[in-house]
């Protein structure tokens, strides 16, 4: 089940990014006093009272040359589309503005839980000034100071009350996967081809997908799949669906819900920076990854074309050397019959458990081939290894000093483990731990 989502909305320069960073617990956005400067990440995760959740800062979604009020309106609509709970941020220093009233009207009609956070209430004397915000019709205003961290806990206490119930059980036998990629790489056509039906409206114009609906289906062998459709940008999407940060955000949410990610590239266009950014997030999240090169039927080929394209992918995605690459065409159905089987294989590899005796044989053989490094005269000693988790496979290696395990040596051990066992399509984690 996906994490509950909080969206932070409000006009520019009310302190949305400061509150976003406070909730996330780290300073991950660039924050200045000039309106409209939020850059970098607009989507992250947080935790409060034992509940994990996702956070969206809608102010980070650049809507280009749209008029000021239209931008604010559409950011509020994004929040309504994406969030379980909305935090509406206003400024206690400036009072209610026309832009605040516009956002309040949109949110009031949404039937989503809205928490009104009056920011920049930096001292107790200012608390008496927040009563005017009752006029927005959104219930009790919460006085907060993003810069000092005051009142944030009260806002989160209220947010958690509105989170959806997490008692829903998921079918462990169902493989959940998503197709992610830039607009116009052919995600919708691939979905239709995999399902064998015209479930999604498809055209050659970027951003024509109308909706995002998850789909269950079974293979001929009886394996259950849940396809998480990220192609859709909702009916309002024509305004902002090609906005890079918005589409990246949607991809991140899909990755969060998936076991396996199909990273779709356009054979005609090659690899773009956005592809690398989203693939990096899937890798860091520990998801299984398959690289799908679509529209292969449109490429002029010779005997080296596929090999050259694969070499380019390996060069651009060096950290995904474990991910299988498949060249397909949604139009001609080329190699599409191999996708479900490949997804099943990656799922099996994600769940693979290695007996400790076998694992330690491989690790000790690796040390014999390439002795452990030294640092300032002190040598790393490896005592034993054990697997502690799957999805992704995670190995704890007990050592004398954790700091002596350099990244390069951990990578060497990972490569030796991969040579010995089948982990195609899944990242694996190596965690050094000091033996007590």
Swiss-Prot record:
Where the record annotates domain KH-like, the positions are 352-436
Family annotation (Pfam families): KH_dom-like (PF14714), MMR_HSR1 (PF01926)
Keyword Repeat listed: yes
SUPFAM superfamilies (alphabetical) = P-loop containing nucleoside triphosphate hydrolases
Instruction: Give residues annotated as binding GTP 2.
Output: 181-188, 229-233, 294-297
Residues given in the record as GTP 1 binding sites: 10-17, 57-61, 119-122
Give all residue intervals belonging to the EngA-type G domain. Answer: 4-167, 175-351
Give me any GO biological process, just one: ribosome biogenesis
Its keywords, alphabetically, are:
GTP-binding, Nucleotide-binding, Repeat, Ribosome biogenesis
Q: Which GO MF terms are attached to this record?
A: GTP binding; ribosome binding
Superkingdom field: Bacteria
Output the InterPro entries linked to this UniProt entry: G_ENGA (IPR031166), GTP-bd (IPR006073), GTPase_Der (IPR016484), KH_dom-like (IPR032859), KH_dom-like_a/b (IPR015946), P-loop_NTPase (IPR027417), Small_GTP-bd (IPR005225)
Provide the assembly information: Associates with the 50S ribosomal subunit.
Give the protein family: Belongs to the TRAFAC class TrmE-Era-EngA-EngB-Septin-like GTPase superfamily. EngA (Der) GTPase family.
What does the record give as the function of this protein? Answer: GTPase that plays an essential role in the late steps of ribosome biogenesis.
Would you tell me the protein name for this molecule?
GTPase Der
Name the gene behind this protein: der
């Amino acid at each position: 089940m996906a994490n509950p989502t909080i969206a932070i909305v409000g006009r520019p320069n009310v302190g949305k990014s400061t509150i976003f960073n406070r909730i996330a617990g780290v300073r991950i956005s660039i924050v200045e006093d000039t309106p409209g400067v939020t850059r970098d990440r607009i989507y992250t995760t947080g935790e409060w009272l034992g509940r994990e959740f996702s956070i969206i800062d809608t102010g980070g979604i650049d809507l280009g040359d749209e008029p000021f009020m239209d931008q604010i309106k559409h950011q509020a609509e994004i929040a309504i589309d994406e969030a379980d709970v909305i935090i509406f941020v206003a400024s206690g220093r400036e009072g209610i503005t026309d832009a605040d009233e516009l956002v309040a009207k949109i949110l009031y009609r949404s039937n989503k839980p809205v928490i009104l956070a009056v920011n920049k209430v930096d001292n107790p004397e200012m608390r008496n000034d927040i009563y005017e915000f009752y006029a927005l019709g959104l219930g009790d205003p919460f006085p907060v100071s993003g810069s000092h961290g005051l009142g944030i806990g009260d806002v989160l206490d209220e947010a958690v009350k509105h989170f959806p119930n997490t008692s829903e059980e998921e079918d462990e036998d169902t493989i959940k996967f998503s197709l992610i990629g830039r607009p116009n790489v052919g995600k919708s056509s691939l979905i239709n081809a995999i399902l064998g039906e015209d479930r999604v409206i498809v055209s050659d114009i970027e951003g024509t997908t109308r909706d995002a609906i998850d789909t269950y289906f079974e293979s001929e062998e009886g394996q259950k799949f849940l396809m998480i459709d990220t192609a859709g940008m909702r009916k309002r999407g024509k305004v902002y669906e090609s906005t890079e940060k918005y589409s990246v955000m949607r991809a991140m949410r899909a990755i969060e819900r998936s076991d396996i990610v199909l990273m779709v590239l356009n054979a005609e266009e090659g690899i773009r920076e956005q592809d690398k950014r989203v693939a990096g997030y899937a890798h860091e999240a520990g998801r299984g990854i398959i690289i799908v090169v679509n529209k292969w039927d449109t490429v002029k080929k010779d005997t080296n074309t596929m090999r050259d394209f694969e070499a380019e992918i390996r060069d651009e995605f060096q950290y995904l050397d474990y991910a299988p690459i498949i060249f397909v065409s949604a139009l001609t159905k080329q190699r599409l019959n191999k996708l479900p089987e490949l997804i099943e294989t990656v799922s099996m590899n994600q769940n693979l458990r290695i007996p400790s005796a076998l694992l330690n044989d491989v690790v000790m053989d690796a040390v014999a081939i390439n002795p452990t490094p030294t640092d300032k005269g002190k040598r790393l000693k490896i005592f034993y290894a054990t697997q502690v988790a799957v999805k992704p496979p995670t190995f704890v290696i007990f050592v004398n000093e954790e700091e002596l395990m350099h990244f390069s040596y951990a990578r060497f051990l990972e490569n030796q483990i991969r040579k010995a066992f089948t982990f195609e399509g899944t990242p694996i984690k190596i965690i050094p731990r000091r033996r007590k």
